[in-house]
Each structure stands twice: as C-alpha cells, then as structure tokens.
Amino acid sequence: MKKDISEILKKIINNLGYNLEEVTISKSNRPDLCDFQCNDIFKLAKENHKNPIELGEEIVGSVNNYEEFNTYFKEVTFARPGFINIKVSNDLINKYLKIIKEDEKKLLNQEPKETFVIDYGGPNVAKPLHVGHMRTAIVGESIKRIINYMGHNTISDVHLGDFGLQIGEVIYGVLRDKLSIDEIDIKYLDKIYPEMNAICKENEEIKNECANITKQLQDGNQEYRRLWKKILEVSKQDIKKNYDFLDVSFDYWYGESDAYDYLEETEKILKEKNLVEESEGALVVNVKKDSDTKEIPPLLFKKSNGAYLYASTDLSTILQRTKDFNPDHILYVVDNRQELHFTQVFRTSEKADIMPQEKLEFLGYGTVNGEDGKPYKTRSGNTPKLENLFNEAKEIFISKKEDNKNMSEEDVNKIVNSILKFADLSNTRTKDYIFDLNKFSDVTGKTGPYILYTYLRINKILKSQNKNLELSNNIYNEPDRDLRLKLLEYSDAINYAYKERMPHYIADYVYNLCVSANIFYQNNHIMNMEDEINKNDWLYVLTLTNKLIKQCLKLLVIDIPSIM
C-alpha cells in the first residue's frame, strides 16, 4: 500500500515540475492524526530553493485535486513545518485485505531465488545441552523458516562439535573407568564430562594426555575411533530428543569431523596463494586490514604439533559447502562472542578465493540471563540442562491455573514451547535478555500464551460461523479501522525480519496485531450483530487476523494447542 501512495505522490510532485526520484512514506507515530507521513518536503525544498511550507501546501493542494483522490485517500493535510499527513481510503485498505485473503505472499518483496546454507544448533558432543543451546536452535530455525517463506532454498546443518578436546577428555575417562563400549550412555556422559573438565583445569599432565588422545583420534587411531563413534551415537540421540521437543530440524547432521576430509586441500590452497606464514612452528594467515579500528590477530590454521583448530575446520567446512551445495549465502547463527573468530575465518575464505566475505554472514546472538543480569541459573543455582528447563517451564505453567492440570501433554508442550520461544524471539537477536519464566508464562502481556489465547479466542468465533465471506467497502469504527491497518503491516514485518535476519520484527508485529484484535473484540459484539453485511465484514477481518497470527507463529516455530 505504501508503494501505491508513494507512486501517486511522486507522479503529482513531478507533474508540478519538481524532480523527486523516490517518495518516502512511513507509518505515522501519531495514528490519531494520520495513517502515514511523508517527510520529503525539506529535502525537496532545499533542492529547489523553495520555502518548505509553501512547497508543502502546493503539493497537498494538488493531491486534494487529484482525479482519483477518493480511491486512495480519505484525507491529506499539510503539517508545519514540512510534513504531509495521509489518511488512506476504505477502498485502498479493503483492496489490500482482499489480496491478503487470496495470498499474503503477494505483498512481500520479490527476489530471485537463492540458496542459503544455515549453520545453527552446533552443540559440542558429549556435553549436555543447556539453556544457551536453546537460543541458537530457536533463532536459527526461525531464520530458516523466514528465508524459506520468502521463496528461497535453505540447507540447514547442525555442525556438531564432535572432534575437539572434550572428546579426548571423555575417552580418557572411559579408559580410566574401564568401561565396556555398551556401558557408555547419556547418564555416564553427563557425569564424566564435567568431572574430566574440572580435573584438566587442575592437572596439566592429564590435560596434555587428553590433548594427545584427541590428536590421535583425529589422526585415525582405531580404538579411539571406536569409542568416539559410540560417544557420538549416544550424544546425538540426546541432542535430537531435545531438538525434537523444540520442533527444530536439520537437513544435515555434519560435524567438525567431516571437515577433516577437506583440511589438506584447504591447506594446499592457502599455501599455493602464499597466504600462510610460519610463526613459532605454527601456520598462520594474516587477515588484518588497514581500515581496522581494532586489533585483528592472524588466523591460527595449524599448531606447531600439527594439530588443527576450530578455525581450520570452519574454513574447511566453507570449502566443503561450496563443493556440495554451491550456495549463494552461508549464515552462521552463533554466540556474539564468536565474532572475532568468524571475522578471521571469513577474511581468510575471501583471500583464498574459497567464498567471498560478503556471502558469509555472522548472525550473533546475546546471552540468556537471570534476573541478576548474569547467565541464567536454575533455582538450585546450576546452569540448567535444556531438558530441566522444559520441565521447570511446565511446572510453572501448570501451577498458574487449576484447569491447566487437566490439559493433554501435547497441548502443555505446545504452550511451554510458546513460552520459551516467544520469550527468546521477541528480543532483538543481538541483545542479552532477562529470562523470567513466571512473567513469560502469563496469558497477559507480551508472551507466547497471550498470542495463543488470542488465536483460540478468535477461532472459537469463526468455528461457529460456516460462511463463505465477502468484504464490503465499509469500515465501521476506529477499532475496526485500526485492526485492518494492522493487518496491512504484515508484509513490512516479514520483509524487515528477512532483510535483517531478525525474527523479533515478526514477534513484535504478531503481539501488536493481537492487541488490536482484542481491542476490536472488546468494542464490537460480533455474535450479537444483526446487520449481516457488518457481521460478515467483521468475520472476514477476524479470519484474516487468524490467518496471519497462525503464519507468524509458524515462522516463530510455535505450534497452536487445541485449548487453553
């Protein structure tokens, strides 16, 4: 709709003899005065050496004399010192509502289809999943769904950390405890990793032995490979169970180990392009740029003992992905604290002509904190395992209301998912946020349960009315008009979320849509409406409202329960 308004204003302005290539239309921050605003008068007045007030009044006068004024506008006024205030017509609003009913995707930005590889999830094998893993999984899954919805092809890869020092530590523990391979289970892994990690922090000799085991594993030691495969199998089962609960899925379950097949080729490329330098026996790549405002150290590709590092495997993984998928973009949904690491990797990739840096995107996310502003802990003071967090959220939700105890497990799980996911995705991806389960599980306020409640409330009305609805050109009151205009903001929210890789635009939108829908519902008694045209119009608007709420929830990885 903004595009229509922009084109009309541009045509009128150009017909007056002024040259303006693009007219900027923005949503009004004073909806009591107007729907949209144009702030280009100052720029245009400066370019044409005109008084902005005189110019603005001239343009608005011409708009009001436009032959199709009533088709597009209800009211267009000039506000000093240089703003054009626009109220759009019922005809224009309803025209776009009909497009949404037919296919809401028609209002989205259209781009040539591209292929995106999305790297998210990425837990380290043999470690229990904790609250921090929830963020990468949920944010990554949502971004994947948004990109798919925009018409692009996505390839998702969990990229497990399955070949690092933690594996050497666990293998050391297995050998020390003289376990048979069949005795390695998730209970043992949950116990042995933190135990060995603590020992290695205190005992340098054991730490070096674990590093040696890791190196031999990477070099192909058969016994260590046998134990590693069992550890990987057990750990993946647990990871999949947690990700299944979150409705997070991957096309590929590759790991760091898969990149080892490409390390020699990657090293060869770096050497052929004279990019590697020796530094105390190690191989490094200088990635510093003259324009850098902070120190960017060299990428350490290979240690002096011949061992490879995360930077080596991440670079080799880019090579692997270019060969396997030939993607247009590779996206990495990882902790903000990894930014320097990926800057080094991306710059090396570009210098080596593996993949240009502009096609590699670092999508950092902030941490999940408790009310004290520190990383979130359980009531007992521990960093919560993801499974324990699910159970804690269930307990809190069920305790909120007596009827919640009688809900099916499937419905409870869907609501718990909405609590966790909406809490996460309604916050700006790059920011830390305070995780408050009591607040996030309320049915009021900016929460997942509030969105679900609104949908089910509307759905109850719609299910009682089996009608093939058509829309008249009437709009009956301000809550009605506000809801219709809110429906038309949908495409902006999706376009912004896609462009910025920021799901919170969708979370913000669907919350505001639900607020408008509830105000509309409170002010308009639909079921008691005797005027059939009016009643049908309102049912039509509510049908569109639920259509968009449902689609937003899908993009936010939230399923709808049968009852609340």
Predicted features, each with a name:
Residues 2-94, 110-564:
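Non-catalytic interaction-recognition regions
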Residues 101-111:
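Flexible, low-complexity linker/hinge segments
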Residues 95-101:
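Short, charged, solvent-exposed linker or helix-capping segments at domain edges/interfaces
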